[in-house]
From Swiss-Prot:
This is ATP synthase subunit delta. Its main location: membrane. It comes from Fusobacterium nucleatum subsp. nucleatum (strain ATCC 25586 / DSM 15643 / BCRC 10681 / CIP 101130 / JCM 8532 / KCTC 2640 / LMG 13131 / VPI 4355). The keyword Membrane applies. HAMAP family: ATP_synth_delta_bact. GO terms for biological process: proton motive force-driven ATP synthesis. One of its GO terms (molecular function) is proton-transporting ATP synthase activity, rotational mechanism. Keywords: ATP synthesis, Cell inner membrane, Cell membrane, CF(1), Hydrogen ion transport, Ion transport, Membrane, Transport. Belongs to the ATPase delta chain family. Transmembrane segments: none annotated.
Length: 174
């Protein structure tokens, strides 16, 4: 709970800075890269979280990794480090992305089907969902043979279940 609150607070401030600098995408990419490195590289994570290692050493490493492209944007990451919030980077990035999606009217949609859709089917689905919601669609497709046929679409908290599995379950209950 506390980490998600920290994520909201930091991401809001970072997003405002990013908008002022017209660096929204670049800052997101830097934060996301830091998060991926933090989550996948145990050595990096232990190094960053180790209280016995001086922050100047940590800053030097972050500068080495992320300072090549834009050292000014690196200050955001260094600030997060100075405040001892690198352990919240996942939440900061997630909340930052939510703000970005909300401001740019982008909607995350997760769809599950029994087989891969063709490019034409994907385009039709995206167009239909975009038309219904009035937003740009970011579609993630998952394959699950257990649903037998049809599909399941998840938009935020809403689930549209048109799977044959659900139909069979409903038929058995009646």
């Amino acid at each position: 709970m506390i980490k998600s609150q920290v994520g909201r607070r930091y991401s809001k401030a970072i997003f405002e800075i990013a908008e002022e600098k017209k660096q929204v995408k670049e800052i997101y990419e830097m934060l996301n890269s830091a998060m991926v490195l933090y989550r996948t590289d145990k050595e990096f994570k232990h190094f960053i979280l180790n209280p016995l290692i001086d922050n100047e050493q940590k800053k030097s490493v972050l500068n080495e990794i992320f300072g090549k492209d834009n050292s000014e944007n690196l200050n955001i990451l260094l600030y997060i480090l100075d405040k001892g919030r690198m352990n919240c980077i996942k939440y900061i990035v997630a909340e930052y992305l939510k703000i970005y999606y909300r401001k740019n009217r982008i909607l995350d949609v997760k769809a599950t089907f029994t087989k891969e859709l063709t490019d034409e089917q994907k385009k039709k689905l995206i167009d239909k969902l975009s038309q219904k919601t009035g937003k740009e669609i970011n579609l993630e497709i998952k394959i699950d043979k257990d649903i037998l046929g049809g599909g399941i679409i998840k938009i935020g908290d809403k689930i549209i279940d048109g799977s044959i599995r659900r139909e069979l379950d409903n038929w058995r209950k009646s």
